Structure formats: C-alpha cells, structure tokens
C-alpha cells in the first residue's frame, strides 16, 4: 500500500522527556527523529505540532494561582522551545526542517503562514508548528487539528504512550479493550478523552481522519502512514 501524501503529527512535550521528569531525553528524541526520517524518505510530507508539557503547562500554572491567559502564554513559549529542539535534532540527522510559530518571534522562527508552510512541505521539508493556536485557553491538540485542516493533511496522528484508544485505562483495567476504529461521534459521546472536545469537533467538521498510536513502538509511525494495522483510527465512518 502506498503511503499517505501529507500528515500532521501531534507530539506531546511529555513524550520528549522520555523516562525523565523534565526537559529532553536524548535517546527518546533520537528514536522519534529516526521514525520521522523514515517516513520523509517515503516521500510523505510531514507537519508537526509539539506540546510543551515537558517544560511548562499553562493549566498547571493556573492551578498555582497564575492568571490563566498568562500561564497559557508561557505554555505556548514552551512549545516554541520544543519546536526549536526538534528542528535541531532533525537537522543533525540530515532532515531539512523549518519552524513556524503561531505568533511571530523574530530570529526564532517564521510566523505561521499557510501558503508558505505548504510550499515547505512540498519541497520535502518537515514543518514544525510552535506556539499552539496563538491564543490562551486552547490546547495543543486543538492546534494540531487546526494546522492539519489548514495544510490539508490526509491524516492527523496523535502520538501517545499507548497503542490506541481503549474502553478504559489499560494501565488500571485489565479488561480494557482497544478499539480498531471509532467514529468522532462515539469518541465524543463516550468521553474517551483522547483529544479535547474542540479538537474532535474540528476533525469531524473537516472530515479529517485521526490515528492514535504508540510512538514509542519502533517503526509505528511508518506503519501508520503505510495504512497497516497500527493504533486506532477515528473518522466520520
């Protein structure tokens, strides 16, 4: 089966720290970069939205008494730091990459511009979108759905630590069962919590298929883009 043309990969900040409790884990980063390099080699155009939870979470700051808008702005800056770290790791591995930020930050990355992003993707460069949506109160999951729709991605891929969507937390419930496929309506109605409601709704409205998979499994990203049985696919059916 031929790979998809263009994907948007949502990579959490927590994933970047691997087994550590903060920052970046070199071995984990190298593993992600290797998987991304493999799909780029297939001719797949790759956009990435990265979270910031390994450095700062806006919701956590708000719980500590910060103004939520201020805390979310700090969280958005954390995602830009992660975008730069990921770009550097990709470039050191020989993968051309660019950073676009939701708000313009001079000398750090280009401000997001849809046509420019598509040109970079078509030229074979990985485009990493930092800064979330550029607005407080929106998660990076929503940013991923938004950017996926804007760049006309064929698939939105949510990279997680589990190999799909389950009926319950598989770490707590031994009877939890993995879904092979789901509709967005089912996922929202059952409050499965894989994405926030705004992100789910945007995917549903834009008819954007989502695959939830375990990015820590070697080769999982390549199997997803090749259409193999990996993770859980969520769509409008």
Swiss-Prot record:
UniProtKB keywords: ATP-binding, Cytoplasm, Kinase, Nucleotide-binding, Pyrimidine biosynthesis, Transferase
Entry keyword Flavoprotein:
no
Named in its record, the pathway it takes part in is: Pyrimidine metabolism; CTP biosynthesis via de novo pathway; UDP from UMP (UMPK route): step 1/1
Compartments where found: Cytoplasm
Q: What is its EC number?
A: 2.7.4.22
Q: Which reaction does it catalyse?
A: UMP + ATP = UDP + ADP
What activity regulation does UniProt give? Inhibited by UTP.
Q: Which InterPro entries match?
A: AceGlu_kinase-like_sf (IPR036393), Asp/Glu/Uridylate_kinase (IPR001048), Uridylate_kinase (IPR011817), Uridylate_kinase_bac (IPR015963)
Q: Summarize where UMP binds, as residue positions.
A: 52, 72, 133-140
Q: Does the keyword Transport apply?
A: no
Q: Where does ATP bind?
A: 10-13, 53, 57, 160, 166, 169
One GO biological-process annotation of the entry reads: 'de novo' CTP biosynthetic process
As for what it does, the entry says:
Catalyzes the reversible phosphorylation of UMP to UDP.
Q: Which family does it belong to?
A: Belongs to the UMP kinase family.
Quote the protein name from its UniProt record: Uridylate kinase
UniProt lists the gene as pyrH
